[in-house]
Curated annotation (Swiss-Prot):
PANTHER family, per database record: PEROXIDE STRESS RESISTANCE PROTEIN YAAA (PTHR30283:SF4), PEROXIDE STRESS RESPONSE PROTEIN YAAA (PTHR30283)
Name this polypeptide is given: UPF0246 protein YaaA
HAMAP family (UniProt xref): UPF0246
Gene behind the chain: yaaA
GO BP annotations listed: response to hydroperoxide
């Protein structure tokens, strides 16, 4: 199985590293093209494009300017340890063993607006470039047109090399839109997490994001290889609902806390 997750806007470049091992992103040539485009933007333009504060716009203008392709542990950090959003709160990669990192390196991929596809141990320099942003580039009006089939081809390389039969889509819609499902050489499985509120089950963004991280960790902890094994997921009160699941979706519910 291959797990797909989204990146996070919140980054951590201060905490102690859980491992000193690293690899380098495989699509850095593409990243450099995007950096070239992003450097043309002033801080006010970044503010408008990303709908962020003056302070964040200044920070990201500086990040684009400072970005350079020679990554080391001094100027970059492993992606799975650098991202710190709700998904990564559930994943808790800072507590991985070396064996966990090994399994994740084979079976987990992070989709990224700037880096395309990241393996857990791939070094990355800090950035903010969400996949849905309309950054004009040589290939079109946004990042979906920029990446085209590149991300799908990169995922297929892993799928074909490892004989993977299933892709577990734990990414957000914004990021998964960069993948061409019909061109993937594997079957798609999408876990959906519903929380009860006022007697009704629905997707609550914060909880759903954390649950995607919890599910990723569950797969890694237990070295799972088959989709049916996902049905045993029961962390933090979630349970599998067979009746609600269909068409490649596995529905997990949790009663109101």
């Amino acid at each position: 199985m291959l797990i797909l997750i989204s990146p996070a806007k919140t980054l951590d470049y201060q905490s102690p590293l859980a491992t000193t091992r690293f690899t380098l992103p495989e699509l850095l040539d593409h990243s450099q093209q995007l950096i070239h485009e992003a450097r043309k933007l002033s801080a006010p333009q970044i503010k408008k494009l990303m709908n962020i504060s003056d302070k964040l716009a200044d920070l990201n203008a500086t990040r684009f300017h400072d970005w350079q392709p020679n990554f080391t542990l001094e100027n970059a950090r492993q992606a799975i340890l650098a991202f710190k959003g709700d998904v990564y709160t559930g994943l808790q990669a800072e507590t991985f063993s070396e064996e966990d990192f090994d399994f994740a390196q084979q079976h987990l991929r992070m989709l990224s607006g700037l880096y395309g596809v990241l393996r857990p141990l791939d070094l990355m320099q800090p950035y903010r470039l969400e996949m849905g942003i309309r950054l004009e580039n040589a290939k079109g009006k946004d990042l979906y047109q920029f990446w085209g089939d590149v991300i799908t081809h990169k995922l297929n390389e892993v799928i074909d090399a490892q004989g993977i039969r299933f892709v577990i889509n734990l990414a957000s819609d914004e990021y998964f839109k960069s993948v061409k499902p019909k061109k993937l050489n594997a079957e798609l499985i999408k876990p959906v997490f519903l929380d009860e509120k006022n007697g009704k089950f629905k997707v609550i963004s914060f909880y759903a994001k954390k649950a995607r991280g919890l599910m990723s960790r569950f797969i890694i902890d237990n070295r799972l290889t088959k989709p049916e094994q996902l049905k045993d997921f029961n962390r933090e009160g979630y349970f599998f609902d067979e009746e609600a699941s269909a068409n490649g979706e596995l529905v997990f519910k949790r009663h109101e806390q």
